[in-house]
Amino acid sequence: MKWDKEKLEGYNPGEIEAKWYDFWEKEGYFHQDPDLSREPYSIVMPPPNVTGQLHMGHALDNTLQDILIRFKRMSGYNVVWIPGTDHAGIATQVKVEEQLAKEEGKTRYDIGREEFLKRVWAWKEKYGNRIEQQVRRLGSSCDWSRKRFTMDDICARAVREVFVALYEKGLIYQGHRITNWCPHCHTALSDIEVDHKDEAGHLWYVKYPVIGEDDYIMIATTRPETIMGDTAVAVNPEDERMKKYIGKKVLVPLVNREVEVIADDYVDIEFGTGAVKITPAHDPNDFEMGERHNLESIMIMNLDGTMNAAAGKEFDGMTLKECRKAVVSDLEKLGLLDHVEELNHAVGHCSRCKTTVEPLSTKQWFVRMKPLAEEALAAVDRGDTKFIPGRFTKIYDHWLENIQDWCISRQLWWGHQIPVWYCDDCGEVSASRTDLTECPHCHSKHIHQDPDVLDTWFSSALWPFSTMGWPDKTPDLQHFFPTSVLVTGYDIIFFWVARMMFATCEFMKEVPFKDVFIHGLVRDSQGRKMSKSLGNGIDPLEVSDMYGADALRFTLVTGNTPGNDMRFYMERVEANRNFANKIWNASKFVIMNLEDYDPEFVPTTDDFTLADRWILTSFNQVVRQVTKGLGSYELGDAAATVYDFTWNSFCDWYIELAKQRLYKSDDKRSRQTAQYVLVRVLTGALALLHPFMPFVTEHLWQHLPHEGESLIVAPWPTVDEALDFAEDAATMNIMMEAVKAIRNMRAEANVPMGKKAPVTLVPADEAMAEVLHTYETYFKTLAFVDEVHILKTTDAKPENAVVTVVPRSEVYLLLKDLIDVEKETARVAKEQEKTRGEIERLEKKLSNKGFTDKAPEAVVAKEKEKLAAYREKAEALNKRMEDLKHL
């Protein structure tokens, strides 16, 4: 039996958190080698950007993972949690480009690719560990010896293998398609790198003359500057107004190009005029329509966002803004602009440089997704991978069923350079797992590698198996793969979860993870998404410094339900810091009463009091509930259960009852039994709390009698059936109801705290009478009672008393000598009058249709809640007044 007997001072989160993280890591508790005799449990950490700083989303994500890992470690599983960071292509490149411009006044082109990449690697080495230190600060017990980086040698080898294998199967190809293009960063962007903002714009109504007729089709467009790239006008085949135009030719304004009116179901009959211009090179939906109808695609913009010669000599070289102004002016002069309407619409911006993103048809590398999506869909359909909550399966299925080919090339320098070489002599295109020095076809030395790099998500898609050393058959891969669970937000199901599924199903022939545990976003107290623009972001490290990482973790988990967003309140962090302090003080009290503790002493069941039997039974029940909650991803419920047990059952009830026996030096066996129960239940509660609040629980556990070296590897509490006393626990609960009834009656009657009240109890049966007689001291200890009278049901009931009925008993509180009845009657009457006034005011307000029809729904609901509360209060005051009349 071990036991740190050093005196426990006041609770200081900062001191203990640094101490215990270093201890765990130094002792190697985060690391486990593959052990075939134990069931594996593995998680790969979603890699934060190497440029990143910890935000509340990271804090939630890592807290949930750490809770699961600590629970499974204590439950005896062979556990591994692999951390790592993502090279974050464009994000990192932009950071270094900004630094280069600021410090040297140069661009990356000025210093060249090789030198620029040296600078990026140097920046990564200098700042890349910052996010790791922040993850540590939260208490994340991941195995840092297995740390991976998406561009380290192991991951780079996996990336090459996957690219070349897909290329050889014809699943990677080069072609022209619409991509999100940033004219400033000069690269294609993934959808997640585009921020959509509502902007005030216009809808221009333009006439397209019908060839050979004195007629025209009116189209509505938000982008008149792209008219010169139009190669068709489309209408819905079901639109009766437009059927007569299908197959006819119209003239595209300004460039006088003859184009056909085509029919396509995509066209929304209700939008604009029901006719739309089709510009395949500059709109993703138009591109798809162009593919269906074999339309010409005309690029009228340069990659820097200016107009080119194909737009017409007049517009060549103009910026988009200049071109729009000129086009609108020319349309007006020609009498082809009918009218303009104001319109708010979403406009995409590059998330890094904030430039407006242009949909452009550019030559890129793509992954052919439909063949790969089939097995990823089937695996979830078979139940090989389950989404928690299950409703997210539909979102996953819908995306994969409607998937488009994936653009994987980026016009950046930082990232995995595409492993494709072009021969300058014979034109051969070669994909290779190793760097080429000559053309495999003609052996020419005149070859060059594709300058583009892969989308960051390409390497991230391989994360579940590349982190374990694939393509080598490593011990980690053989034992820990597939991983047990992926913990992630619902916002990246498309970008990451689905891609990991298809990549792993293709290359590992099994799923990457058995479960996908989805959480929501952390929003501010008003329900808004945290963002730089709103200035409402909260730094988790600042919160940890103020209240402790344990309090932050507990706030994040108790406010969280699977798949749902949560609101973050600083008041809750403070309350959970108070909870940690409560546990600290309770532990301090127990430790102070262990001077004569005998670790060899084991009481018999006869030694246990009613309170002992109740708390031991309650602890068993809590072990069941918390274990079940953690096993079914109801982490918030599990945390709330152990919180309620520790604060209420143990601290507020059991410790108070145990004090009588601890202070009785004449009954050694009773004192020893109380010590035994206190230590057993407190160390057990600390173990249950450990996954949620690892630091404070480790510290307190070390100061209590225990077996083993550290709580992080201590056995998870189990139910001891021999210490289940269901009937006694039920009886104790009745006693507690009676105590609470007395407390409530005292509070309602405004009995001063210093005055003890005589109580009369009338049990419903002999068995209950015996319990009340045996444990009447509980009422004196917990309910501030000086006298307890126990009557038979046939005895006369006391007069001048208020009464409450609890299970199997009636409770009478004699108030006459405790309060000034006249004064209390006047106070209650005044409160009744005030309450009636509030009820009248709210009833009048809610009967006003001007208010109920115009006010926001939430405001009306709030007023209804207030009215219900005041009506409830009025009933309580009426009862109180009746009680006073009988005193």
Language-model features, listed with the residues they occupy:
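Auxiliary tRNA-acceptor-end handling modules of aminoacyl-tRNA synthetases
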Residues: M1-E9, V80, T222, V367, ...
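Non-catalytic terminal extensions that flank enzyme cores
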Residues: M1-M56, V79, S351, I583
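N-terminal catalytic cores of NTP/NDP-binding nucleotidyl/phosphoryl-transfer enzymes
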Residues: D35-V96, V159, A220-T221, T226, ...
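Short, solvent-exposed turn/loop segments enriched in Gly/Ser/Thr/Pro and often Arg
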Residues: L36-R38, P46-P47, V80-Q93, K147-C155, ...
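Conserved phosphate/anionic-ligand binding catalytic regions in large, soluble enzymes, centered on
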Residues: A59, G84, I217-V235, C350-R352, ...
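Extended active-site and interfacial segments that coordinate phosphate-rich ligands
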Residues: A59-I67, I217-P253, V276-D283, H293-I300, ...
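Feature 926 captures the class I aminoacyl-tRNA synthetase adenylation module centered on the KMSKS loop
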Residues: Y205, H398-F458, L462, E506-A549, ...
